[in-house]
Regions:
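N-terminal glycine-rich phosphate-binding loop and ensuing alpha1 helix
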Residues: 1-46
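Hydrophobic/aromatic residues located in beta-strands of well-ordered beta-sheets
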Residues: 2, 43-45, 89, 119, ...
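Short, high-confidence coil segments that cap the C-terminus of an alpha-helix
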Residues: 40, 86, 114-118
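Short phosphate-binding loop-to-helix
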Residues: 44, 50-109
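A conserved hydrophobic position in a structured secondary element of the catalytic/binding core
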Residues: 47-48, 99, 175, 194
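Conserved core of the sugar-phosphate nucleotidyltransferase
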Residues: 100-187
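Donor nucleotide-sugar recognition loop
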Residues: 187-194
Length: 194
């Protein structure tokens, strides 16, 4: 099941999922990108807002109301997992209207082959602005491609703050049911999520 969490009360940009981008709301654009890869019946928007719920219904998008107590998009996906049991869940953030269809396709295929692992998509950091930005999550992996550490800081760091080979998170994740079940029991955010 591909779940698109959508929160109306964003601190930085309230109402973000409903913002029109060339006449189409952001959440609908994100859904449309996902629908190019995944069948409509296997996509669900999870929201805590009636405006988003109504927009999804109007656009024939499967939607579920979730609690307004969810701290993160992953909490919203964990809440969906309590109601709809699947082997694994793919989380595509609702504010990714330009997410690459090819990236979604590759990620879905990889997730199907690795259903027992938590998977976090990433790509190269291409510019110094992203490398230094606290809004971009940077990631460090071991030689087996296992995530060691994620940070809003510029990692790996260097003395001159120059761009070096670095990776950033892409807002698409995959979780096995059991991992989401455990995640849903955590009631606090880590500092990186704040």
């Amino acid at each position: 099941l591909l779940v698109i969490p959508a929160r109306y009360k964003s601190k930085r940009l309230p109402g973000k999922p409903l913002i029109n981008l060339k006449g189409i709301p952001m959440i609908v654009r994100t859904y449309n990108q996902c629908k190019k890869v995944v069948d409509h019946s296997k996509i669900l928007v999870a929201t805590d807002d009636k405006k988003i719920l109504n927009l999804c219904k109007k656009n024939n998008i499967n939607v579920m109301m979730t609690s307004n107590k969810c701290l993160t998009g992953t909490d919203r996906v964990a809440e969906v997992a309590k109601k709809i049991k699947k082997n694994f869940y793919i989380n595509v953030q609702g504010d990714e209207p330009l997410i690459s269809v090819n990236d979604i396709k590759k990620f879905v295929e990889y997730s199907k082959k690795n259903q027992n692992n938590v998977i976090n998509a990433y790509t190269n950091v291409e510019n110094l602005k992203d490398y230094l930005s606290p809004n971009v999550i940077k990631m460090i992996f071991d030689k087996s491609n296992n995530l060691i550490y994620a940070s809003r800081s510029n990692i790996p760091g260097n003395k001159k703050n120059k761009l070096i080979k670095a990776y950033k998170q892409v807002c698409i994740y995959s979780f096995p049911y059991n991992h989401l079940k455990l995640f849903g029991k955590i009631k606090t955010k880590t500092r990186i999520e704040q």
